[in-house]
Amino acid sequence: MNKLKIGILFGGSSREREVSFAGGRTVYDNLDKTLFEPIPLFVDSFGNLLILDWQFIYKGSIRDFYPPSEFLPESTRGFQIYAENLGSLTHQEQIRLTMKLGTRIEFAQLPDVIDFAFLCLHGSDGEDGRIQGMLEYYRIPYSGSGILSSAIGMNKVIQKELMKKSGFNVPEVTVINRSEWLASSNRKSFIKNLKSVGFPCVVKAANQGSSIGISVLKNNDVDAFIHAVNKSLFICEISRTEWNSMTFDAKTEWIKKVSDIREGIGLPAKINNRTIYHPEELLGVLIQLFGEMEDIVSIAAMEAETEVIIESFITGKEFSCIVITMESR
């Protein structure tokens, strides 16, 4: 009996790539090998695709093998990085990063490589309808929601509006636009938008996963509110007083946290009009700016969020279900 070739797409460029990587490994391990042939299809930071050699599947995180150690710049503080932290790479430079990790393929080759796509990709390019549209173009069946439902599910603002119009019970919601927030000279004034929502409330990015950039506000603490909105927009602000109060080791740990896509804003990021790619570079720039007596430095992730959604806190028990549609329907 010919085994069904299951392409497990995992990794990707989103903030949730580590969750995706771990999920892909779980699927790879648990597929019934008597019926299926699992093919690990790793999507790198730039959207390139390769059949990943099996030994890399069992690394603790993506940063443990990609980018490969020979491409890593020297770091006196032991910073771990993702491939995009190497700078603005040409396509050929991107290819060189993956040459020793597996077999590089094009998405157009997938119909000849797999029979079914098991999608473990998270966030942008994974759950927003893009990969789904491409797979449908190549007539490859895949797991999960279709194009439209994926796109709607990814944008929480549109999702809430459609649910409300369809008669579903939804919590009270207010939305803050990034451009309006950045242009305002009085961000404290935005807290008046929370009157209809009440407290406690949840502040989260409109186009990210359910665990990314989220804060819970218990009361109308203005400073906590501003911090929560900045967090959801992936903006970090630090004052000279805060910076100078830290030891050098504490500054290093702060840089590591801010540079981490899972708990910080991630890099590359912008300070004024300068693009910062590497944590070591960020450390040096902050030392320079605060040495020049800058009062507050704002660091904004290049992978920006356009909207922040604030909604009433829901109490209850979460649940999920899987709906399987028969081929005939």
Language-model features: where?
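Conserved metal-phosphate-binding beta-hairpin within the catalytic cores
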Residues: 135, 311-313, 321-323
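Short, well-ordered secondary-structure micro-motifs
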Residues: 51-53, 213-214, 322-323
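Active-site loop ensemble at the mouth of alpha/beta enzyme cores that anchors a bound cofactor
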Residues: 323-329
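C-terminal active-site-proximal or functional interface alpha/beta core segments in diverse enzymes
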Residues: 318
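Active-site nucleotide/adenylate-binding loops and adjacent lid/helix of ATP-dependent enzymes
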Residues: 2-9, 14, 22, 107, ...
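ATP-binding N-terminal substructure of ATP-dependent carboxylate-amine bond-forming enzymes
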Residues: 1-158, 162-165, 176-189
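Short, flexible active-site-adjacent loop segments at beta-strand->alpha-helix junctions, enriched
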Residues: 122-123, 207, 327
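Short, Asp-centered acidic motifs that coordinate Mg2+ and/or phosphate
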Residues: 116, 201, 323
